[in-house]
Design a protein with these regions (language model features):
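Bacterial Sec-dependent N-terminal signal peptides
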Residues: 1-22
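A short, N-terminal "cap"/entry segment at the start of jelly-roll beta-barrel domains
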Residues: 17-57, 137-157
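Short, conserved beta-strand element in jelly-roll/cupin
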Residues: 62-66, 76-91, 130-132
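Histidine-centered catalytic micro-motifs
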Residues: 71-78, 113-119
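Short acidic-glycine-tyrosine-enriched beta hairpin
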Residues: 95-112
Length: 157
């Protein structure tokens, strides 16, 4: 029995590695690449976890925004879902009051509704964005408007 166990023990890592090559594995844990400074202020990193293709109708992108970074107003032709996995942020739809997002929150931006999301002044935010199609950028989010939201939603110390 002992003689059979030893060879199997040493072969196990190779079997596991061989199995992984049969699958298309991605990880949202990787930071991604620094995004070009377009349609936002501050710093952002994007990890395109999954890209839509002929067999998949949506994208999943992990986005990390450093504290005090903002994303401009935009909309999508189909609903977008944001899943906050780290930090805290802000979210606002046109014509509605802004809200503060925290780890574990999931929010759905309805199709064709202008909205923005960003990190808080104090904390980075990381979220998974699940969406289809292109993003349509509609308006620059002014620093004064972001600061007003930050002051309104500031957590008491």
């Amino acid at each position: 029995m002992k003689k059979k166990f030893v060879p199997l023990f040493f072969m196990f890592p190779f079997v596991v590695l061989a199995q992984n090559s049969q699958y298309n594995l991605n990880s949202y844990l990787e930071q991604g690449t620094k995004a070009p400074n377009t349609h936002y202020l501050g710093e952002a990193w994007l990890n395109r976890v999954l890209q839509a293709d002929e067999n998949l109708s949506f994208n999943i992108t992990k986005a990390t925004f450093s504290a005090n970074s903002t994303l401009d107003w935009h909309k999508h032709s189909e609903s977008q879902v944001l899943v906050v996995v780290d930090g805290s942020g802000y979210y606002q739809e046109k014509g509605k009051n802004p809200i503060r997002l925290k780890v574990g929150d999931i929010i759905r931006a309805p199709a064709n509704v202008e909205h923005w999301h960003a990190a808080t002044k104090e904390n980075d935010v990381t979220y998974l964005a699940i969406y289809s199609g292109e993003t349509q950028w509609t308006q620059v989010l002014l620093r004064e408007d972001y600061d007003r939201v930050a002051n309104t939603l500031k957590v008491p110390q």
